[in-house]
């Protein structure tokens, strides 16, 4: 204090007491713990920092720390995993499992739901139902429930038909025999009460997203990289990717992975129908595509200036359909027909993502380069994409942080935090983890290597 007189000391003591009564000291302890956990520094070191200068992941984790450590016993979390990297999601899963609070969360991250949710509440067809189990059993539980609902509705319809026919029969008999009038009135009353109670809940309609990714036969070696270096991003590495393989590109956040996909797109000699050439990517060494490899790129940011101002129907008709009905039928398979006349930029993120996948299908790409394809897809669309890739006759290289999606891949090309590129038998999500190169395989020409000096 600049002044040490008695009135000043009294005011200072009063202010401290007021701060304590308001819970200020407890708040300081809480926020110190939050800042250390989320930002790696104590509250005193960052107390004046503008929140807008934090990354999206830092902001989200700081808020989640405050909520999970705070006094509230019930938390409502809307997409709490957005902006979190995989390490952040794993931290969130652990905290959700450990907390004694009641948590209601909305999420499309299937791995998060599987690891953290004890019950799954589904809202569909204006009804709500609860699955008391892990997400990995959710799909079967939903099928079983829908089968029960369909059977109940079938029985109700049969009984409804029987009661209506009984009323008709008794009406005819009552017209000829007064003694049947009481039975007729009883049947009418019974039918009325049955209809007043109403039918059981209808089984909800399944999402009808049908991705017919076909591809085509190419040379055995689909991608060849020799001493390839992404200038200023990653150290030189070698790798070969063979026809039909599913390779996930994983690793630390930051530049490198998306550049790798754009580089593969830029060196193509043959592009699918409707695809636009990619801008050159600075690199040294060799990056080459095999015979008859025609790559299609799914852009993570959905940045497609060539589609701006055009409707999905117009886009499909330009390159892939001569008739409007053909275009709308294709859009309907991706549940896009209802927005077929909206400009591309007004579509939701999920709609733009599904349209991009449809264009890859119609273009006939034999190599799919997918940059975070499930980021904006709901659960049904993400599962439809995985089903489409299972039957796809071509090669797939995908950058992803979706752990559930990554389970379906054969190989993992890891872009490490130390600028190395190497193969791993399992996905590596920790940005600080350094892995060892995978030993070269020598079996029947189907070998695949990735090296980083």
Give each language-model segment a name.
Residues 7-18, 164-174, 206:
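A short, surface-exposed helix-loop junction/capping segment
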């Amino acid at each position: 204090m600049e002044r040490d007189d008695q009135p000043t000391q009294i005011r200072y003591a009063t202010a401290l007491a007021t701060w304590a009564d308001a819970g200020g000291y407890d708040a300081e302890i809480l926020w110190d713990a939050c800042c250390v956990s989320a930002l790696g520094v104590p509250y005193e070191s960052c107390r004046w920092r503008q929140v807008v200068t934090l990354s999206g992941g830092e902001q989200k984790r700081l808020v989640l720390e405050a909520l999970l450590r705070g006094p509230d016993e019930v938390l409502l979390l809307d997409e709490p995993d957005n902006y979190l990297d995989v390490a952040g999601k794993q931290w969130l899963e652990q905290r959700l499992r450990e907390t004694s609070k009641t948590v209601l969360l909305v999420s499309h991250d299937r791995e998060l739901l599987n690891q953290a949710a004890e019950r799954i509440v589904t809202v569909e067809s204006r009804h709500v139902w609860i699955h008391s189990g892990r997400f990995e059993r959710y799909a079967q539980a939903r099928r079983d429930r829908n089968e029960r609902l369909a059977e109940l509705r079938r029985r109700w319809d049969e009984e409804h038909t029987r009661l209506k026919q009984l009323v008709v029969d008794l009406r005819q008999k009552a017209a000829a025999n007064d003694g049947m009038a009481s039975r007729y009135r009883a049947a009418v009353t019974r039918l009325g009460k049955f209809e007043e109670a109403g039918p059981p809940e209808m089984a909800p309609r399944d999402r009808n997203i049908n991705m017919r990714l076909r591809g085509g036969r190419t040379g055995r070696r689909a991608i060849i990289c020799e001493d390839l270096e992404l200038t200023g991003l990653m150290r030189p590495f070698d790798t070969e990717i063979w026809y039909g393989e599913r390779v996930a590109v994983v690793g630390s956040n930051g530049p490198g992975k998306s550049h790798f996909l754009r580089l593969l797109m830029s060196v193509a000699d043959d592009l699918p129908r409707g695809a636009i050439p990619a801008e050159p990517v600075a690199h040294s060494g060799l990056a080459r595509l095999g015979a008859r490899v025609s790559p299609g790129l799914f852009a993570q940011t959905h940045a497609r200036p060539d589609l701006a101002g055009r409707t999905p129907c117009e886009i499909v008709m330009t390159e892939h359909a001569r008739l409007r009905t053909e275009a709308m039928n294709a859009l309907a398979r991706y549940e896009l027909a209802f927005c077929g006349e909206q400009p591309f930029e007004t579509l939701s993120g999920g709609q733009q993502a599904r349209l991009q996948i449809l264009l890859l299908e119609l273009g006939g790409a034999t190599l799919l380069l997918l940059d975070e394809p499930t980021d904006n897809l709901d659960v049904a669309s993400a599962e439809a994409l995985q089903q489409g890739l299972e039957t796809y006759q071509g090669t797939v290289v995908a950058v992803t942080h979706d752990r559930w999606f990554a389970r379906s891949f054969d190989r993992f090309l890891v872009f490490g935090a130390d600028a190395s590129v190497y193969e791993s038998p399992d996905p590596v999500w920790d940005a600080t983890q350094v892995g060892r190169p995978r030993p070269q395989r020598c079996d029947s020409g189907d070998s695949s290597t990735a090296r980083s000096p």
